[in-house]
Amino acid sequence: MKKTNIALIGLLMGWASIANAQTVKSPNGNVAVTFSLTGNGVPTYEMTYKGKAVVKPSHLGLELAKNKHASKGMNETSLMDGFEKTATKTTTFDETWKPVWGETATIRNHYNELEVDLNQPSSKRNIVIRFRVYDDGMGLRYEFPQQPELNYFVIKDEHTQFAMASDHTAWWLPGDYDTQEQETQESKLSEIRKRFRDAVNWDNSSVSVFSETGVQTSLQMKSNDGLYINIHEAACANYATMHLNLDDKTMTFESWLTPDATGLKGFMQTPCETPWRTVMVSDDARDMLANNLILNLNEPCKIEDTSWIHPTKYCGVWWEMIAGGKSWAYTDEFSSVKLGQTDYAHAKPNGHHPANTANVKKYIDFAAANGLDQVLVEGWNIGWEDWFGHWKDYVFDFVTPYPDFDLKGLNEYAHSKGVKLMMHHETSSSTQNYERHMEDAFNLMNKYGYDAVKTGYVGDIIPRGDHHYSQSMNNHYLHVIKEAAKHHIMVNGHEATRPTGLCRTWPNLVGNESARGTEYEAFGGSDPNHTVILPFTRLQGGPMDYTPGILETQLSTWCNNKSYVHTTLVGQLALYLTMYSPLQMAADLPENYQKYNDAFQFIKDVACDWDDSRYLEAEPARYITVARKAKGTNNWFVGGKTGLAPHLSVLKLDFLDKGRKYEATIYADAKDADYEKNPKAYTITKRTVKKGDVLKLQQVRGGGFAISLKAL
C-alpha cells in the first residue's frame, strides 16, 4: 500500500482563507469547497466544479430533541447556530488499496481534507465538521468529541442543505422510510411535487412516504450546462438512513432522516460521528459510474482473513415461485402456524412446493453441469403458511426443514457435485425473532457447509412501529453482517437499507437488493430505462443482486402469467456487465436455459470479479457500455445496455493488450428484435480482433449486446 498523509499550509496545496471563509480544493484543482460562518454563527458551505456552481451556499447543523434521555434533558439546545471557529486543519491523503472483490484490482484514495473545529459558547459544546475533497466530488460529516456538556443527545432532525444552482433534470425515487422498490422517475426538480403520488408504488408491502417533495438517495441529476451531480451518503452506521426533502421554490434539498418508532431520528453517545454526506460531480457521465468516492469514505476492511469470501454465480429455486405461482409453503392445511406446536409430519403436501428434495437435486445437477457455484433454495424451512401480513413475531426458526426437504442429504449431494447450497433466511421483518435464532441458524449453516445466506425483510418491521431505514434497523443489518463474518458466512441482504459502501469494511456483504429488481418483471414489468438508471443511482453505494438472466422473456410460454420482461434476450446478457455485482444469479429455469443454450453460454462464461473496468459510453436512462477484464486472466467482457430508445454503439477496442489477438463472441440484437414485439431475436457471431479494432453494434428498444473476448 502506498500512503502519504502530510499536513500542509496555505495556498501551496490549494487552500485559501479569506476573512471568515476557508477553501479546500481537490488534488487536481477541479473541485473546490468553501466553508464559512454566517453573522449569527451558522455553519455554511458551497461547492464548485471547474468554476461552475454545484452546491450554492448551504447551511449545516442538527436540531436536538428536548428529551429526558439526553444529557441536558428538557433543557436541550440545538447545534444549529451561535458557533465560533476555534481551529482549522488541512491535510492531504493518498493511498492505493486492494478490495477483496470489485470492479478493479486496486482503488486510489486521494483527497485533500479540511477539518473545522467549532465551539458554541452558549452551550459550551464543541463539534467538528470535516470535509474530504476528491477530484470527482466531496464528502462532509459532523463529529462530536466526548466532552462534559455533550455526552448523550437525541436527534430531532439533521439540517444539512444542498442548494442546487438551477432546476436540474433528476432521476429520483419517492422518499420512503420502508422501500426502494419503486420505478425511478425522470423530471425537472420543479416537477417532483406534481408527479409524486403517481410515482409511488402504493401496492408495495410497506410504503411510508413523508413529503410530496421527498426523494431518496442516491439522487442523480444533470444540469443544463452539462454537469452530472449525485447526492448520497457513505458509511451509514449507527445512524438513520438519509433522504432528501426539496424546497422547490429555492431548489434546495435538506437532509431528512428516517425516524424510529418514537418518531425521533437518532440516539447518540459521544464520541461519535454522522455518516458522510456526499456530492459527486463530473462533466462526463462515465466518471459517475467509475467513481469510488463512496467506498473510499468507508473504513478499511475489518476482517483479517478474507480467504473464505469469494464471488459467486448461482441459480435457484425462486423464479418458479415469483413468476410461476408455485408456493414457498409446504401445505395448504394450516391457516396459522405455531413453531414447536404445529405438526407438519401428518400434513398433506400441497403439491406445488418446489423446495423439495427431488426438484432441488435437478437444480444441483444443472449447476454442476454448467459451472455454477451455488443453488439458492427458498421455502425450505417451516413457517411459510402464515408468514406474511400478520405482523407476527415468532414466524421462522431458520433451522427446521419441511418434511420434503432433506437438509443433510441435499448438502451432501451438492458437495459431491462440487456445488454448495445457498441458505435463505426470510425474516418477515421480525428482526428480534431473527436475532434470537441467529446463532443457531448460523451454526446450522456451518454444520452443513453453507457459506452464503440471502436474507429478506418483507413486510412491516418488528419491533412494531419501526421503519426499515431507522437507526435501530441499520444497526440490526450491520449486526447480522458482523455475526455472519464470525461464522465465515457471506450475506446477500434483500429489502434491507440501501448500501453506503460498508462492503469495503465488511466485504462478506457481497450483495444487496434495495431496489426494484428482476422480480418485478413478473409483476407487470419495469420500464426499459430502469436498468440504465440504476448504475447511476442505487449501485453508487454498492453492488446489487439484480437477479438477471431471464432468457424466456414471455412468461406465458411456461406459466399462467401474462407479464413479460421489458428487455430483449440479449439485453438480459448485458446486465451481467452493466449491473456490477460479485454475486450473480442465473435466475431463469433450467429448462429455459436449455431452450436458449447458445445464449446461455455467455452467462456460463462471464466472470463475477474483475481486474479492470472501463466505462466506454454512458448517459443516464439512455445507454451504458462497459468493458471489464476478468480477474487473473487476459480475457475481457463487454456489455452494452440501452433503454427505451435504440442506440448505435461504436466500440474502439483500445483497452485490449497490444500485440495480442482475441476471439470475440458477439451476442447482439437481431435487426428485427424489439423488447415487446420480438424480444428473443438475436445473433451470435465470432471473429478475431485486436487492439484498435472498431465494432459497431446496434441496440434496439430495450436491447443490448454482450461480447466475450478470449485472449489467444
Task: Please tell me what each predicted stretch does.
Residues 1-23:
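Bacterial Sec-dependent N-terminal signal peptides
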Residues 23-304:
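N-terminal accessory beta-strand-rich subdomains and adjacent acidic, glycine-rich linkers
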Residues 269-362, 370, 374:
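An acidic-aromatic substrate-binding cleft motif
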Residues 359-380, 447-451:
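Catalytic domains of carbohydrate-active enzymes, especially glycoside hydrolases
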Residues 378-564, 568:
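Aromatic- and carboxylate-enriched substrate-binding clefts and catalytic-loop regions
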Residues 570-617:
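Catalytic cores of secreted or luminal carbohydrate-active enzymes
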Residues 620-662, 705-706:
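Carbohydrate-binding surface patches
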Residues 686-712:
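C-terminal beta-strand-rich structural cap/linker in extracellular carbohydrate-active enzymes
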